[in-house]
Amino acid sequence: MPFFLVLLHNSDMDQKLLAFQKLASTFKSHGYHLYLVGGTVRDYLLGKELDDMDAVSDATPKEIESFLPNIETTFAYLGSLKYKSEEGIKFDITTLRKESGYLDNRHPSQITFVKDLSVDYRRRDFTVNALYMDADLKIIDHCNGENDLKNHLLKMIGDPEARIKEDPLRILRAIRFHLMFNLEIDDALLKAMHNNFSLLKNITDAKIRSELNKIKDEQVDVEMKKDIFAQFDIANLQGVIK
């Protein structure tokens, strides 16, 4: 059982989890697995309201299209589909994958579909965002993320220096999660954030604006926000916020 007090009496959460279990049953009947993942599982463990449901499967987009009706396939070439259940619950379904070759400091140049969660989790950013949940609502954790969440610790999966060089926007995501969930930033991650802060110049203003606006809109501790913004001279980035 999770160590968190999960609010299963919450009717909205119940409805969404039941919709997931129903959808997972459909996948199983066709020989595939479906798991909830990332922020959906993190928020479930924290007892927070669930938004759209993020899920992963060992089925490819083409395989999913063969048995699941009314799916949106705009990003199928990237391994991602959108689906709305009969109950109106929205799911983002991504095929398990491995990513490599971040040539533009943002997007992988190579995506390879895989079958194993122990491979898929390595492409994710932070341990608290790399948790999976199966159809029985059992947590699957390959990187001690549940324990890090319990201990209010934000850690990068893999080498923080390399992962931030892949995508410098992870610096701002780390700041956002630090503030949103009161997570202490791991020393190695914090050092890598400072070392590579200048790489944010390679990210578009629109992407930076989006992350900063998410931070701005959160109900966060004022002193924590003031401290972390001062550490990283966020004021120089705030000029892109409209």
Identify the role of each PLM range.
Residues F3-K242:
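Catalytic cores of the polymerase beta-like nucleotidyltransferase superfamily
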